[in-house]
Amino acid sequence: MRCPYCQHPDSDVIDTRKLHNGETIRRRRKCEACGRRFTTYERVEMVSITVVKKNGEREPYDREKLMRGVRTACYRRPVPAQALEALANDIEAELMARDEPEVPSSLIGDMVMRRLRAIDDVAYIRFASVYRSFADIGKLREAVDELLGQGH
């Protein structure tokens, strides 16, 4: 692996760890030339999935876009970063298992909502308020009442 500091083409692996139930490998490396250390992450490349938006536009699936939405919903909530990574990994595994080149954005939104609901009620309501585009406080109240009515 090329050193990000001096661009030397070779480095030694000094530590390897599995993360996220073995779905990601973290490697600590040391450059053979300059001796500086750096970290690399290795994960299986997803099959190309196209997301079909509500307006019919198509765009490539973007894990970072998913993570930004989930992080925003969980802002200042007691949700560990590992839980968010696991949520994204679960969604990606489910998308890959479907073995379909195109998926509607609504399917991904539903997957996120189902998982957020199990993680944190406030994050779920925050995400739902944007995802479902609540037009008024009444719709938001219905979502909260539904959540409370189901024993959360």
UniProtKB/Swiss-Prot annotation:
One of its GO terms (biological process) is negative regulation of DNA-templated transcription. Disulfide bonds: none annotated. Keywords: ATP-binding, DNA-binding, Metal-binding, Nucleotide-binding, Repressor, Transcription, Transcription regulation, Zinc, Zinc-finger. Coiled coil: none annotated. Its cofactor is Zn(2+). Binds 1 zinc ion. One of its GO terms (molecular function) is DNA binding. InterPro entries: ATP-cone_dom, NrdR-like_N, RNR_NrdR-like. It holds the Pfam family ATP-cone. A zinc finger (unnamed) spans 3-34. It comes from the Bacteria. Negatively regulates transcription of bacterial ribonucleotide reductase nrd genes and operons by binding to NrdR-boxes. Belongs to the NrdR family. NCBIfam families: transcriptional regulator NrdR. This is Transcriptional repressor NrdR. The lineage of its organism: Bacteria, Bacillati, Chloroflexota, Chloroflexia, Chloroflexales.
